[in-house]
Regions:
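Terminal, low-structured helical/coil segments at or just beyond the last alpha-helical repeat
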Residues: 226-284
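Hydrophobic face of amphipathic alpha-helices that form TPR/SEL1-like repeat modules
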Residues: 20-29, 54-61, 89-97, 122-130, ...
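Short helix-capping/linker turns of helical repeat alpha-solenoids
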Residues: 14-16, 46-48, 61-63, 82-84, ...
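Structural motif corresponding to the intra-repeat A-B loop/turn of tetratricopeptide repeats
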Residues: 30, 66, 98, 130-132, ...
């Protein structure tokens, strides 16, 4: 987050109008987002197509303006006509969501040939079958996307090589590792499981926890819930678990537990202890 903010601020200093809306998005600053949108709109309306894709993005996600897929498509199309690979891909992605695959494919092919990784990934996953016997097309485009450091492609290749007839766990781990380095949360979570269970690699609790925390910091809900469960266990053991009280409190709150919920859990724990003691007394 800090690095992204610094990059956006520097881009803004260098005159990149799109950085203003990105900075507003990062900082959740409505005023800055609106100012950024207005600056982009003014630029594009005056004929500067350099910002057409960014304006389409603002409309698609309602950043600084009301959400409008129709307007998003309009500006993505403007960007695509300028031979902008990102604009082509964003327009194709919206066509895919509307199940208009015939319109999406030529845009993706064109962007993919320009070596845009996400276009290559979308082409592989929407127009070829990775899990069929005839999967050469899917693998071709996924591998090209992976060569362009596309995190989703790296993750999908990791999944592909971790199961089925083509299983190659060493290769899968390599793909997951590369995807995790590019902040793919599901890849980080997979690595956490791999190191926790000692699959192919030596079992390593420290690495398992490292990748679990990385996934959680990237807002992976499954990872957050797992860390919260560990934090609750640590809390129940009066801090005898694998994290200190401050960290435990952080993950518990991150998972959405309220003070009321924690009080109820404490009551349940007390009842469980009482029942356990009674059972012991009965058996003596």
């Amino acid at each position: 987050m800090k690095e992204a903010t610094q990059v956006a601020k520097r881009a803004l200093e260098l005159g990149n109008e799109a950085a203003k809306i990105k900075l507003g998005e990062i900082q959740e600053d409505e005023k800055l987002m609106k100012a950024g949108f207005n600056a982009l709109k003014k630029k594009v309306d005056s004929g500067d197509m350099h910002y057409a894709n960014s304006l389409g993005y603002a409309y698609e996600f309602g950043i600084g303006t009301s959400l409008s897929i129709k307007e998003a498509m309009k500006y993505y199309e403007m960007a695509a006509k300028q031979n902008n690979a990102l604009g082509m891909t964003n327009l194709a992605d919206l066509y895919i969501q509307e199940d208009k695959l015939k319109k999406a494919k030529p845009l993706l092919v064109k962007a993919a040939k320009k070596e845009y990784g996400y276009a290559q990934y979308l082409l592989a996953m929407n127009f070829f079958d990775l899990y069929s016997e005839n999967n050469k097309g899917a693998l071709f485009w996924l591998e090209r996307a992976a060569n362009n450091d596309e995190p989703e492609a790296l993750y999908q290749l990791g999944v592909y090589y971790s199961e089925g007839a083509e299983a190659d766990l060493a290769k899968a781990i390599n793909y997951f590792q590369r995807a995790a380095e590019l902040n793919h949360s599901d890849a980080a979570l997979e690595l956490s499981y791999i190191y926790d269970e000692g699959i192919i690699v030596e079992q390593d609790d420290d690495k398992a926890l490292f990748f679990l925390k990385k996934a959680a910091e990237l807002d992976n809900q499954e990872a957050i819930d797992e860390l919260a469960a560990q934090a609750l266990a640590s809390r129940a053991q009066n801090g005898q678990g694998n994290m200190d009280a401050k960290e435990a409190e952080y993950w518990i709150k991150k998972a959405g537990y309220t003070e009321e919920m924690l009080k109820e859990l404490d009551k349940l724990q007390e009842k469980s202890l009482e029942m356990f003691k009674k059972m012991q007394e009965t058996n003596q």
